[in-house]
Amino acid sequence: MFDILMYLFENYVHSEVELLVDQDELTKELTRAGFHQSEIIKALSWLERLADIQEAGTPYLCNHDQQSFRIYTKAEMEKIDVESRGFLLFLEQIKVLSVETREMVIDRVMEIDEPTLNLDDLKWVILMVLFNAPGHESAYEQMEDLIFEQPDGRLHS
């Protein structure tokens, strides 16, 4: 399923090619690309739920304190390793993620049908969430820079 999400993001969304609106046509395209029907359905459902979260028009979280600290459930800790949880905290500290977008990311990660998700995969989920979150264009650009920009020059002398 995650491979399909990556394929769609890289070939349609990130490359700014118009995404096929017709789900049947998109399913056929993904089948021609070599993906299995059951995985295609899961990926498209995942994307629909992401869109539903964005379009709900109601706050994703109610009455939260901006200074609160996120405690992960056992299932979340099993799926999101320490390095990835640290990266989420880092992104909050530098204001790339808000409390709401962090929770959206965790929600989307937990719906991916993989037992664990590595840091590189988490970064792509974050990009997908920020891309689909109205008003977070700047955060999306910052996240893109963190992923794609390579540091100039030597890091150590």
From Swiss-Prot:
Pfam families: DUF494. It comes from the Bacteria. Signal peptide: none annotated. Belongs to the Smg family. HAMAP family: Smg. This is Protein Smg homolog. It comes from Shewanella halifaxensis (strain HAW-EB4).
